């Protein structure tokens, strides 16, 4: 049995969605960012930094959503969600799969300053503005690709789309996607996928992101 350790509205949504796209049977265990349980010895034994996702699979536990995606795609190639080694699109697939962590780091900083740091004296409006601009630049890079095709790879939908879609799933709270017409259409295509809708239904209660945070504060 595969077991996903998950928090709603987090990077573990990528793994949840990927499992649904692959049609794999799995058990879903929800954790809470705020109750201290992710600092427990039980959780840290699975994910030493105390982060989600953690995935129990094939007799071991993996952490890091990008590594999990690459592992699942390589060990279950019949799902057809990644070009394999030697394929002409393999390098491009890996670029976009891991580009998602550039997006994730920006979203983490924006989340810290807009949501987690509740004392205004601890927040940096400069960081909010700079990170929002950097996020826009990343979404602009996706815009350039999907302006000419439906998905990140010419072959069609892949795990790379699941990875970069985090820029829309969470990024839409910090950047107005209406500025990016091709990305907006791409986001609609992704939301229309049955596996995406099922993953959303299993994600859990929205306790982190409940409103938009753009435009960022002015100097």
Language-model segments: what does each one mean?
Residues 33-34, 160, 204:
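Conserved beta-strand edge residues that scaffold enzyme active sites
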Residues 73, 167-168, 200:
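Active-site-flanking alpha-helical
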Residues 79-84, 106-109, 151-155, 197-202, ...:
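Short, hydrophobic secondary-structure boundary micro-motifs
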Residues 100-192:
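GST-like fold's C-terminal all-alpha helical module
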Residues 203-219:
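Acidic/histidine-enriched, glycine/proline-rich intrinsically disordered or flexible terminal extensions
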């Amino acid at each position: 049995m595969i077991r996903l350790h998950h928090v709603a509205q987090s990077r573990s949504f990528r793994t949840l969605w990927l499992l649904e796209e692959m049609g794999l049977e799995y058990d879903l265990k929800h954790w809470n960012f705020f109750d201290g349980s992710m600092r427990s010895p039980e959780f840290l034994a699975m994910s030493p930094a105390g982060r989600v996702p953690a995935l129990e699979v094939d007799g071991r536990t993996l952490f890091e959503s990008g590594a999990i995606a690459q592992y699942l795609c390589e060990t279950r190639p019949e799902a057809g969600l990644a070009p394999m080694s030697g394929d002409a699109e393999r390098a491009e697939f890996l670029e976009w799969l891991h580009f998602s962590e550039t997006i994730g780091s920006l979203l983490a900083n924006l989340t810290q300053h807009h949501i987690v740091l509740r004392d205004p004296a601890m927040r940096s409006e400069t960081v909010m503005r700079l990170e929002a601009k950097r996020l826009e630049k990343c979404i602009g890079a996706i815009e350039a690709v999907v302006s000419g095709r439906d998905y990140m790879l010419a072959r069609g939908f892949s795990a790379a789309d699941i990875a970069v879609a985090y820029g829309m799933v969470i990024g839409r709270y910090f950047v107005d996607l209406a500025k990016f017409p091709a990305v907006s259409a791409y986001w609609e295509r992704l939301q229309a996928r049955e596996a995406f809708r099922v993953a959303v239904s299993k994600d859990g209660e929205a306790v982190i992101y409940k409103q938009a945070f753009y435009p960022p504060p002015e100097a």
